[in-house]
């Protein structure tokens, strides 16, 4: 399972973005070579009391018309209810209670999701009385904060983490491998899942997932136990396309966050699109295990070079996914669908792989002997030792002499040496460099 998801909901100009940015701190980062992923910063990683969680800003555009605001608030509340484990409902202590606040509070009450009600813009003790009228919303005790000044945020976060399912932080492995099928509507995600379930005929149950557009299907096979998550995406028509796009991204991101293996499905008759690159970019950022499946391969006119050319074109567009596994199938005819779960299991095993410290350091020592680090300025990086500190994804820490002696091309060389030596095909890996004295 992924980290808990916390969604921030509120009217325009109540301080959602201020709170989001204050909590995220410096944890929002733009990853190079990942097109369009973090430019619209709808999510960020955060931590409180050693609990890591993901924050989602349901904001979007900021209309001025009151009717549009209420419609937007309904959408925000829906997306929070569907994707989040805990909801922060932020209201404006200076402006007071509004019709839109009441509307959303009603939806949140019905959802039964944990809600933390925060009254923002309470910048001093004199303004604390402004919070009391929000008891009328009927969703618990209002907590007075000032997002701009950082006042009251600790108490608010204490309340948020109280609602987390602490069992997800246990080290024990989940017995199910979670696979998220991601991609545009109508590329064949549901068809493939139905094919896999139909062939195996050992469905445990169909359980409504965290969003109205996701269905979690439990499946047991010779390859292991799987949960297949079909992310249908938003299909509602709306004039506010940017807003709908944002909510679609949030839904998809929530599915990716909770997955072990992410399968990007592409329509062979359309090829890859910018939206595909953006979607799989999230999985790459989180260093998930990744497969790219090209569906409807039966509809493509082929010769003996077609598959190789198509794959090379894909890899050219997805340069940041050099480690991903590729598979060409037809969910309709069943062509190569029998290989999907085998390949997913292979990617997952690499995602969950652990390397002993002794063997790891032997490989790094040999890599340095074959090609020593370049001199950066007047210093050359020296690696004292390396160790693996986590799996899912594999995370390594290299202890070095000087941070300023690092060079991106040599770091890429070391990552390639790890991948070649230990077979991390199909999964992202993370390498952290820490300076220490000799």
From Swiss-Prot:
Belongs to the TRAFAC class TrmE-Era-EngA-EngB-Septin-like GTPase superfamily. EngA (Der) GTPase family. GTP 2 binds at residues 183-190, 230-234, 295-298. One of its GO terms (biological process) is ribosome biogenesis. PANTHER family: GTPASE DER. InterPro entries: AAA+_ATPase, G_ENGA, GTP-bd, GTPase_Der, KH_dom-like, KH_dom-like_a/b, P-loop_NTPase, Small_GTP-bd. SMART domains: AAA (SM00382). Residues 4-168, 177-352 form the EngA-type G domain. GTPase that plays an essential role in the late steps of ribosome biogenesis. One of its GO terms (molecular function) is GTP binding. Keywords: GTP-binding, Nucleotide-binding, Repeat, Ribosome biogenesis. Residues 353-437 form the KH-like domain. Disulfide bonds: none annotated. Associates with the 50S ribosomal subunit. PROSITE patterns: G_ENGA. This is GTPase Der. Pfam families: KH_dom-like, MMR_HSR1. It comes from Clostridium beijerinckii (strain ATCC 51743 / NCIMB 8052). GTP 1 binds at residues 10-17, 57-61, 120-123. The keyword GTP-binding applies.
């Amino acid at each position: 399972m992924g980290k808990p998801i916390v969604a921030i909901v509120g009217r325009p100009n109540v301080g959602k973005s201020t709170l989001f940015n204050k909590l995220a701190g410096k944890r929002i980062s733009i990853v190079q070579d990942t097109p369009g992923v973090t430019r619209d910063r709808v999510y960020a990683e955060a931590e409180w009391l050693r609990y890591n969680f993901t924050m989602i800003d349901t904001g979007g555009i900021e209309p001025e018309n009151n009717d549009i605001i209420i419609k937007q608030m309904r959408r925000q509340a829906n997306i929070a209810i569907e994707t989040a484990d805990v909801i922060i409902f932020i209201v404006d202590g200076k402006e007071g209670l509004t019709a839109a606040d009441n509307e959303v509070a009603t939806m949140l009450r019905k959802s039964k999701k944990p809600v933390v009600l925060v009254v923002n813009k309470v910048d001093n003790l004199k303004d604390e009385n402004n919070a009391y009228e929000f008891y009328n919303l009927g969703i618990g005790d209002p907590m007075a904060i000032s997002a701009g000044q950082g006042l009251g945020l600790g108490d608010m976060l204490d309340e948020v983490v109280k609602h987390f399912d602490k069992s997800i932080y246990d080290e024990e492995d989940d017995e199910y491998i979670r696979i998220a099928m991601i991609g545009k509507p109508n590329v064949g995600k549901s068809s493939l899942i139905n094919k896999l379930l139909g062939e195996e005929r050992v469905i445990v149950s169909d359980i409504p997932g965290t969003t109205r557009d996701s269905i979690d299907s439990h499946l047991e096979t010779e390859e292991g136990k799987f949960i297949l998550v079909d992310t249908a995406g938003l299909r509602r028509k709306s004039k506010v396309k940017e807003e709908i796009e944002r909510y679609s991204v949030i839904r998809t991101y929530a599915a990716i966050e909770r997955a072990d293996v992410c399968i990007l499905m592409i329509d062979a008759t359309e090829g890859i699109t910018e939206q595909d690159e953006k979607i799989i970019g999230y999985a790459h950022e989180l260093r998930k295990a990744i497969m790219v499946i090209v569906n409807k391969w039966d509809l493509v006119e082929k010769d003996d070079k077609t598959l190789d050319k198509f794959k090379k074109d894909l890899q050219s567009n997805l340069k940041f996914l050099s480690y991903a596994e590729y598979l060409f199938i037809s969910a309709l005819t069943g062509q190569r669908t029998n290989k999907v779960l085998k390949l997913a299991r292979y990617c997952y095993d690499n995602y969950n792989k652990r390397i002993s410290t002794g063997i790891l350091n032997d490989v790094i020592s040999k890599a340095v002997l074959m090609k020593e680090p370049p001199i950066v300025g007047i210093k050359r990086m020296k690696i004292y030792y390396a160790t693996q500190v986590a799996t899912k994804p594999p995370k390594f820490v290299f202890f070095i002499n000087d941070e300023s002696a690092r060079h991106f091309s040599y770091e890429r060389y070391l990552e390639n040496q790890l991948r070649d030596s230990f077979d991390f095909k199909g999964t992202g890996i993370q390498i952290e460099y820490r300076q220490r004295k000799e």
